[in-house]
């Protein structure tokens, strides 16, 4: 699902349409493990209700500035000060996991105590005999 800021001003619900289309496509095979790749992490309610087990996103730049061992980022785009979803693994309801990457890039502000990261996710079957 694209960044909502990338849609024309007269189409503010563009990301919601994309999410609905992705959800419909994922629902076609109810036995599949459904993964959603989206830009922004703060749309958690919509993601939790969309039928995916795993949500992968970024955009928050890890909170741009971090205070080691104290906070998960000082500021993140579109979340403001002390962002809730700056980087890491989060549970959205009972069945949805969201992983937010701090990413490799930077915003206008330099990263402080916030090294770039590349997230690698290993997905393994609960039933090894089924692959």
Give the ranges of each region predicted by the language model.
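Binuclear metal-dependent hydrolase catalytic cores centered on His/Asp/Glu-rich metal-binding motifs
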Residues: 1-34, 44-45, 110-111
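Flexible, glycine-rich phosphate/dinucleotide-binding loops
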Residues: 7, 107, 127
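Conserved beta-sheet core of the metallophosphoesterase superfamily
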Residues: 41-119
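C-terminal domain-boundary segment and adjacent tail
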Residues: 114, 118-131
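Mid-length scaffold segments of soluble, non-membrane domains
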Residues: 37-39
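Short, Asp-centered acidic motifs that coordinate Mg2+ and/or phosphate
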Residues: 33-35, 53-54
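Beta-strand-turn-beta hairpins that frame and shape the catalytic cleft
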Residues: 1, 20, 27-31, 91-98, ...
């Amino acid at each position: 699902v694209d960044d909502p800021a990338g849609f024309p001003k007269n189409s503010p619900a563009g990301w919601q349409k994309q999410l609905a289309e992705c959800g419909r496509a994922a629902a076609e095979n109810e036995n599949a493990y459904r993964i959603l790749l989206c830009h922004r992490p703060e749309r958690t309610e919509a993601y939790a209700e969309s039928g995916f087990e795993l949500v992968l996103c970024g955009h928050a730049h890890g909170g741009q500035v971090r205070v080691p061992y104290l906070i998960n980022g000082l500021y993140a785009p579109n979340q403001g000060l002390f962002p809730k979803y700056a980087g890491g693994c989060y549970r959205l309801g009972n069945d949805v996991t969201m992983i937010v990457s701090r990413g490799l890039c930077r915003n206008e502000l330099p990263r402080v105590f916030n090294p770039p990261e590349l997230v690698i996710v290993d997905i393994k079957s609960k039933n090894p005999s089924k692959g």
